[in-house]
């Protein structure tokens, strides 16, 4: 789906969203996503991704979901088919740190540059509302990929944070896979 043949991967905001515009439910709950899609539902996206930059809250939610999957909770238990470098942007790295990820503090532009460099010419996937908002405000995003799920959550974390200025998008594709509608937009710069 993404062109990485030039060796200049894109910065892609990637998120699942309820029909009423929420990317997470109350309490940052995201396990509802697995009611509609498995973590490995789109292997071509994982194959085009060279690195991920996530926010601390998204990282913590992911850890809780993975722990729940190991115990057989509502999460699917299937692994996301991505094994590249993961960067977590945070004000306070955990103590002790998680050896599986690189914690970054500081400027969003520097964080994107470092993670993009580690992506090896593939896409840098941005996860997390706050980090995505910072990237969008700074004009660092090339594409937005949205998986629209057939559910109304009613409350939670919105797709974009208040105060984000208008950003014009160019539709690239619209496809459907099972219950999921996949929308891809290019950010007009």
Q: For each predicted feature, which ranges?
A:
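Enzymes that bind and transform nitrogen-containing heteroaromatic metabolites
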Residues: 1-189
């Amino acid at each position: 789906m993404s062109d990485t043949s030039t060796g200049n991967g894109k910065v892609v905001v990637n998120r699942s969203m309820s029909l009423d515009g929420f990317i997470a439910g109350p309490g940052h709950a995201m396990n509802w996503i697995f009611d509609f899609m498995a973590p490995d539902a789109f292997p071509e996206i994982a194959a085009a991704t060279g690195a991920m930059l996530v926010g601390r809250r998204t990282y913590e939610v992911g850890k809780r979901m993975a722990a729940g999957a190991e115990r057989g909770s509502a999460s699917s238990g299937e692994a996301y088919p991505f094994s590249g470098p993961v960067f977590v942007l945070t004000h306070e790295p955990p103590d002790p740190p998680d050896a599986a990820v690189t914690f970054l503090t500081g400027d969003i532009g520097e964080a994107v540059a470092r993670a993009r460099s580690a992506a090896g010419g593939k896409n840098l996937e941005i996860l997390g509302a706050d980090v995505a908002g910072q990237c969008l405000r700074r004009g660092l995003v090339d594409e937005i990929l949205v998986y629209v799920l057939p559910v109304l959550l009613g409350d939670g974390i919105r797709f974009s944070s208040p105060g984000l200025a208008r950003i014009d998008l160019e539709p690239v594709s619209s496809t459907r896979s099972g219950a999921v509608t996949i929308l891809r937009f290019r950010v007009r710069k």
